[in-house]
């Protein structure tokens, strides 16, 4: 028998301690990983609801199990809110992750062995955009495009590659690109070679929802996103379209269920519904505007301190710092900043001489630090502290600078808690 007062703390102290330690880590570290964000207590409440117990194979009104009347309400709420948020005609809220959403799109639109054209992982793409270690590069014949030495997409190069390889599908989107993608140009290229245009907007979905980054839906046949990252919801996936082709919509439905997944995670769909409602609130646009302002403010500090920023700036929530000129590695920078309670991730940069697990750069993102309430002055100060640590790498005062920076970080974390009590 279960009772409502059962707790993990009483039952599994080792697990409970890990949870408490993670709570403390998040409160005491400044999070600058571009793909991470803080979900609201409302989102987490939905994830912990009794919808955890419910199996609901199928779609609203067409379930394979009984007792789904409330699951139908939840899923339809999420669908309707996502349609309103992004201006979509078709929405599927069931994908468990962004990668599974992408797999469903491939399965719906093309066949095994068909050619796809996507952004190279080393140039800012994603594993699922055709990387050879991913299903997208194993099941399909993937051809990759990259960026210029200036860190920008060369659309003429994309066009030439498309004309040469004649892909069935072109993937636009990124995991580490700080500029605005010309969705219309990508569609023009796709139309020229008779390919589908598939956009993965996972990193910028929150900015798009707020109207601060171009919406790909008017241009793409199909769009996917995660529901965390800039969007700030639970970890999950989403498929959208406004192409007007009912046949494509039917294929997408069946490619998610039953082709790629069984029962949907109704508790996560409930959390997605909460997230979409939050994103429709007026203050959400202000938050996303501050995300971009903070990223731009940090970029200026890094440049003033002599560090190269890929593409010389940012128009979204992230940017890449290159250490090629300084002879530093992303791995060393990541580790040193981590000791100072500043969390980033090492990242390859254009013409990177280092191996993928070492790299010559870091990726910095501002969704989480902005969610804490940090303003432009706060993040300028933070970027300066980061440069202090980077300047000290390999020098006698390295540990002293790290220790001093950590104290400053702890102070700002105390002033701006993630979840104020």
UniProtKB/Swiss-Prot annotation:
* SUPFAM superfamilies the record matches: PLP-dependent transferases
Co-factor requirement? pyridoxal 5'-phosphate
- Would I find Cytoplasm among this entry's keywords? yes
Name positions with the PTM N6-(pyridoxal phosphate)lysine: 229
Q: Which GO terms describe its cellular component?
A: cytosol
Entry's Gene Ontology molecular function annotations: glycine hydroxymethyltransferase activity; pyridoxal phosphate binding
> What does this protein do, in the record's words?
Catalyzes the reversible interconversion of serine and glycine with tetrahydrofolate (THF) serving as the one-carbon carrier. This reaction serves as the major source of one-carbon groups required for the biosynthesis of purines, thymidylate, methionine, and other important biomolecules. Also exhibits THF-independent aldolase activity toward beta-hydroxyamino acids, producing glycine and aldehydes, via a retro-aldol mechanism.
Q: What is this protein called?
A: Serine hydroxymethyltransferase
Organism listed in the record: Haemophilus influenzae (strain PittEE)
């Amino acid at each position: 028998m279960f009772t409502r007062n059962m707790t993990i703390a009483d039952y599994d102290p080792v697990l409970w301690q890990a949870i408490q330690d993670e709570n403390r880590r998040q409160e005491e570290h400044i999070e600058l990983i571009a793909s991470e964000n803080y979900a609201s207590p409302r989102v987490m409440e939905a994830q912990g609801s009794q919808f955890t117990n419910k199996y609901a194979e199928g779609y609203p009104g067409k379930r394979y199990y009984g007792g789904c009347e409330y699951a139908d309400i939840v899923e339809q709420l999420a669908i309707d809110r996502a349609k309103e948020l992004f201006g979509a005609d078709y929405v599927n809220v069931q994908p468990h992750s962004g990668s599974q959403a992408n797999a469903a799109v491939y399965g719906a639109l093309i066949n095994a062995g068909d050619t796809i054209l996507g952004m190279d992982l080393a140039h800012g793409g994603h594993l699922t955009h055709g990387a050879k270690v991913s299903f997208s590069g194993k099941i399909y014949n993937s051809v990759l495009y990259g960026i210029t030495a200036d860190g920008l997409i060369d659309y003429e190069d994309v066009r030439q590659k498309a004309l040469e390889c004649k892909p069935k599908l072109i993937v636009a989107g990124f995991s580490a690109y700080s500029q605005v993608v010309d969705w219309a140009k990508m569609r023009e290229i796709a139309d020229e070679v008779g390919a589908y245009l598939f956009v993965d907007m996972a990193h910028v979905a929150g900015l798009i929802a707020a109207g601060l980054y171009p919406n790909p839906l008017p241009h793409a046949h199909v769009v996917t996103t995660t529901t965390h990252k800039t969007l700030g919801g639970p970890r999950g996936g989403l498929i959208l379209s406004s192409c007007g082709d009912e046949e494509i919509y039917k294929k997408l439905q069946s490619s998610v269920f039953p082709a790629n997944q069984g029962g949907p995670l109704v508790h996560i769909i409930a959390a997605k519904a909460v997230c979409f409602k939050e994103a429709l609130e007026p203050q959400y646009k202000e938050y996303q505007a501050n995300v971009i302002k903070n990223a731009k403010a940090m970029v200026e500090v890094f440049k003033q301190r002599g560090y190269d920023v890929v593409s010389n700036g940012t128009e979204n929530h992230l940017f890449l710092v290159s250490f090629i000129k300084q002879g530093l590695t992303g791995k060393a920078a990541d580790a040193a900043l981590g000791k100072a309670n500043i969390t980033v991730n090492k990242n390859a940069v254009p013409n990177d001489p280092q191996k993928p697990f070492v790299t010559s750069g870091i990726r910095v993102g501002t969704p989480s630090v902005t969610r804490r309430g940090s303003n432009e002055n706060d993040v300028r100060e933070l970027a300066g502290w980061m440069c202090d640590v980077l300047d000290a790498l390999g020098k006698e005062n390295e540990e002293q600078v790290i220790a001093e920076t950590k104290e400053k970080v702890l102070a700002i974390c105390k002033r701006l808690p993630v979840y104020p009590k």
